[in-house]
Amino acid sequence: MSVGTVLLTALLALVGYLLMKWRSTMRHWQDLGIPCEEPHILMGSMKGVRTARSFNEIWTSYYNKFRGSGPFAGFYWFRRPAVFVLETSLAKQILIKEFNKFTDRGFFHNPEDDPLSGQLFLLDGQKWRTMRNKLSSTFTSGKMKYMFPTVVKVANEFTDVFGQNVAKSPVVEVRELLARFTTDVIGTCAFGIECSSLKDPDAEFREMGRRSLTEQRLGPVGIGFVNSFPNLARRLHMKMTAEPIERFFMRIVRETVAFREQNNIRRNDFMDQLIDLKNKPLMVSQSGESVNLTIEEIAAQAFVFFAAGFETSSTTMGFALYELAQNQDIQNRVRKECQEVIEKCNGELNYESMKDLVYLDQVVSETLRLYTVLPVLNRECLEDYEVPGHPKYVIKKGMPVLIPCGAMHRDEKLYANPNTFNPDNFSPERVKERDSVEWLPFGDGPRNCIGMRFGQMQARIGLALLIKDFKFSVCEKTTIPMTYNKEMFLIASNSGIYLKAERV
């Protein structure tokens, strides 16, 4: 037999083996008899994402198709067999009771080559635990109280700019203005920098904020590859963050840290907390890792605080105004509360008065239910797990787990008339009756959103000052029903939120 024949035979055998391996991977759930859709050969259950369908449309349609069929449905996270949770009882096991078996999110990250991916949201294992412990002190109620006046100052500037826009035209695209408000808040608190995006919509920070959410180094195929073969992608030094965004945030952080250290400047903000963690006397954790932050780690945490903080809060505020514009009775009730609370504070919100904005808090909570900005929670199984009472349903080690919280929030078994905006869903009485995992805009358990307090604070301050002085209603340009951006992982309106605004 010739060498060529041997090589050809070996090649064909290898190809045959790979095809069989490929097929067996994409038949995992079907062979076990677990309900699932037939996967696409490359995209798995994510077929059409960012082109024909948004991420949330995939989660919602999958949930509605399979709910009631068992504790979870089979899913294919690109080429990886994954678990798609259908019951809140299983969500509670994963997020809280069996958290140690589902600690990691399982998203691709590569801090060695892509420093901004070394952020708390993406880190796994001991690296996540160490970083979470480092940052836990930065979002205490005491730290929120320190940052409160800064947020109010920017919010007052925001209402002035908003009023100027209304004076020019009563029809306002609120999404962009709200994003400029939260950009200035986060820029000030995270970097100590006057971003000035309220005055200049093309300010550098605002531009980079936009790009950080829409620009990616990889296309759909590349994203599918790094999520299907994360270890290989790291060995190939693959990166997710676009080069201009990495350069900008690394430069800003280096300059900010150097300026504060050289001039002994203290601002009692998020950046100060990170600098303290960088400069504290060298300590080593029980696992042997340094508990001092590097400049790259500071940049990564500041970046995620900025990118996630401005977008999630501004999106929530925009959808709140969108619903209030369609529900004038609710808007009048929340305005009355805001006016009374602020009047008691001699016209200036203070930290202690925020607890009195009870109905506004219900409005924000209901907005987060209907428009869950992060509509799916991702975890990765760290050891084989049999679902209690369902021996057929086993989550294998290494499997991605998806909890479609946005779809669950619109399940009539959890909320009566689930597509109707009703802040009374979050009255104190109903909240007490409800299991915590039935409302998951910030996740739950040890890996819930560390910035939850800050996000809620800036949204409530901004909304309170806006609603106090302005009435919102729908106009010809208002999109009803809402249409969503197909390219973003987060929930976002497709073409802005146009409302009519007038002073009261």
Swiss-Prot record:
GO CC annotation, single: endoplasmic reticulum membrane
Keyword set includes Iron: yes
Localization of this protein: Endoplasmic reticulum membrane; Microsome membrane
Cofactor: heme
One Pfam family of this chain: p450
Superkingdom of the organism of origin: Eukaryota
EC class name: oxidoreductase
GO molecular function, one term: monooxygenase activity
UniProt-listed Enzyme Commission number(s): 1.14.-.-
Chief subcellular location: endoplasmic reticulum
Key word Oxidoreductase present: yes
Topology versus the membrane: Peripheral membrane protein
InterPro entries for the chain: Cyt_P450, Cyt_P450_CS, Cyt_P450_E_grp-I, Cyt_P450_sf, Insect_CytP450_Detox
Alphabetized UniProt keyword annotations: Endoplasmic reticulum, Heme, Iron, Membrane, Metal-binding, Microsome, Monooxygenase, Oxidoreductase
UniProt binding sites for heme: C449
Job description of the protein: May be involved in the metabolism of insect hormones and in the breakdown of synthetic insecticides.
Family, per entry: Belongs to the cytochrome P450 family.
Listed PANTHER family: CYTOCHROME P450, CYTOCHROME P450 6A16, ISOFORM B-RELATED
Protein name from the UniProt record: Probable cytochrome P450 6a21
